[in-house]
A protein has these predicted regions:
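Short hydrophobic/aromatic-rich motifs at helix boundaries and adjacent loops
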Residues: 16-19, 72-74, 112-114
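Beta1-alpha1 glycine-rich phosphate/pyrophosphate-binding loop at the start
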Residues: 2-14, 24-25, 56-61, 90-158, ...
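Alpha-helix boundary recognition
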Residues: 25, 39, 146, 168-169
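Immediate flanking context of iron-sulfur cluster ligation sites
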Residues: 18-43
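Residue-level marker of structural boundaries
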Residues: 17, 29-30, 72, 129, ...
Length: 202
């Protein structure tokens, strides 16, 4: 999903803070996360046409973060539609699974998310240090999603604790978002040597 940055900056300039935040908090978007972890200086901000001597580039990630925090800190919750009777199972509570759950729940779908870890977020929770992304943000997002009616079945591994066959029998659709669990192994000598530590366990 792309964000309309001109619309965001215009709303902020005119002090329409709620409007600015709602532009960012569309279904499936997590600006409170993206505004903190996105390498914006290498992406959108790197092509900003405003030169440095005029104050550029526009700090887009910081603006997204500010707008989202403004509304979320005030206790905003999205409103789901009435249930349409459809049931969807989502395997994996990482970013893609959470985004899918958010979009579906706001359309009235009954969503159950199965996650083998003890908390949602995937690498947002277990792969990014808290000085970069406060884990309280993920906990806050979980409470928001639960208020949308999303059910989280944590510490539940599909294939171990519940079968795919069971999901197929009890849900209208299944979304599998199990993420990038294993690192890309470089073709280098000494990878099994003393002092070599992989990022996620560290």
């Amino acid at each position: 999903q792309g964000n309309s940055i001109p619309s965001l900056t215009a709303a902020l300039r005119e002090e329409r803070l709620r409007n600015a935040a709602l532009l960012m908090l569309r279904p499936g978007a997590f600006p409170e996360v993206c505004g903190r972890v996105c390498p914006s200086m290498r992406l959108c901000e790197s092509v900003c046409p405003i030169p440095a001597d005029l104050g550029g580039p526009v700090p887009i990630a910081a603006l997204e973060r500010f707008a989202a925090d403004y509304l979320l800190d005030g206790g905003w919750d999205p409103w789901p539609l009435a249930s349409n009777g459809k049931r969807v199972a989502i395997v994996g509570a990482g970013p893609s699974g959470l985004a899918c759950a958010d979009v579906l729940a706001r359309q009235g779908v009954n969503v159950t998310v199965f996650e083998r870890d003890s908390e949602i977020g995937g690498l947002l929770t277990f792969g990014i240090p808290s000085f970069k992304l406060e884990h309280a943000l993920i906990s806050h997002r979980r409470r928001m999603l639960e208020r949308l009616g999303i059910c989280f079945r944590l510490s539940t591994a599909v294939g171990r604790d519940i079968s795919i066959k069971n999901l197929l029998q009890n849900f209208d659709a299944i979304f599998i978002g199990i993420g990038a669990e294993f690192p890309v192994t470089p073709n280098l000598p000494g990878l099994d040597g003393h002092g070599v530590v992989w990022a996620r366990p560290w």
